[in-house]
Amino acid sequence: MHPSQIVKILLEHFETGAVFIASVNGVLDFTNREKAKAAKFLLSSSIGIHEIPVDDDWSARIFAKAIMNCCESGKKLLAWDWKSIISFFVGMYGIKIQIKGTLIDLKILESYNDAKYEKPVSFFEFMSRLKQVMLSNNWSKTNHIYKTVHLPLILDIVPELETVGILTHEKLHAHYEITGQENGRMLCYKAFNRSYVPHVITPEQKEILKPLDFESVFVYMDYKSMEVKMLGWLSKDKEINELCQSEDIYKSAYEKILKTPCDTEEKRSLCKKFLLPVFYGMSAYGISEKIGLPMKTSEAIVDRIKNIFCTSYAWIESYQKKAETDKKAEDFLGKVRNFPDKFYRARNFAVQSPAAIFCLYKLIDLYESLKNLTKIAYNVHDGYMIYSRKDKLKEVILTSHKSLVSECALFPSLYMSVSCSVGRKLTEMKSIKLPK
């Protein structure tokens, strides 16, 4: 298609005030030039539908520039998986599409409501489905999280995570779906020709993955006991929150539940295996079978947890009862998940879904604090892998730590702690003591 035609079509569509844009090809692979040449984009508005091929540098620059010029203040860009489109143009052509108008990504909004639909085929289908989302009872919460968390991830943070890469004998890239997992966490899978999945790095991969240059090292920061602290904050359980103030949550929990000293790492590890699982629905039989404890001991553990932490247990149990009645549940921040069966899963949804948003919010904070200093290599749930030049290591560690432990506006007065490790190789990461 001639560049003048691309510009003409975009101008005509944006003159209507709102344009739906999506990839015809699904997820676009910026790691493979031959696949990239097949890229096509659907444009649809009240005046009709067009498909625009973007098969070389010239057409890519014309297309991106035309969108940036046309989508000015007051215009609406209606999208399906806009994050992947940004990543494609950055990774393949080095072009960052920035718009002044309003971006509405239906894939994100529907996913937050656990609606599993395919990409709309037209502007009119998009608007019909958007209307349904906006009529939902949780729209105000959905919209707030979309603007506060999802938009920054779509426009800046996740495209950078996807395009920054990591080295072996070649550069590999991770692909993320921002609301891909049912409990709100990002989903990562191999969508590219040259890709890896940070969530399931094998021992063999750990041996060969390395930073982007010889002067850099890995810095890994991750939250400690996040779900226990989130459970305490959400349920307002004084007993849980008292545990969270202790030096070691699991050691204190073990001693509180079993009334004996937690004087070995094995005992602490045992507590980690049953504490949250009981809240999430594990029975005494499950503890006995999976952990190997006698049935009487397992029954005593379950009873003690229910009695000591009665406030939080009743709170989390209410989510299961709600799921049994309504066949769905809504978390603290308005995310909806359907439960046609296995209603007990509403228990961990009640905690893990808000925890996922907390981690994504802090990913945004971390990105903003480091953007003039270094880059984030990848994100795995409550963990963040960061690149650091050796001469900037102390600054990167302190800046990252300050960002991650600072208060989150969505969860006032909830404070987390993090651990840190550093290494040139993932198999040689050494723990670093952080300031309190």
List where the protein language model places each region:
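Mixed-charge, glycine-rich, non-catalytic linkers/tails in nucleic-acid processing enzymes
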Residues: 90-91, 96-166, 235-244, 311, ...
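Polymerase palm active-site segment centered on the conserved acidic dipeptide of motif C
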Residues: 305-319, 391-436
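Catalytic palm subdomain of template-directed nucleic-acid polymerases
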Residues: 113-116, 132-134, 283-292, 384-400
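Conserved DEDDh/DEDDy metal-dependent 3′-5′ exonuclease domain
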Residues: 2-4, 14-134, 225
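Short, basic interhelical loop/turn and adjoining N-cap
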Residues: 291-301
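Short Gly/Ser/Thr- and Asp/Glu-enriched loop/turn motifs at secondary-structure junctions
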Residues: 103-105, 269, 302, 377-383
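Conserved catalytic palm subdomain of right-hand nucleotidyl-transferase polymerases, strongest
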Residues: 104-105, 211-227, 278-279, 287-293
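Acidic, glycine-rich two-metal-ion catalytic cores of nucleic acid-processing enzymes
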Residues: 25-38, 42-47, 143-262, 322-370, ...
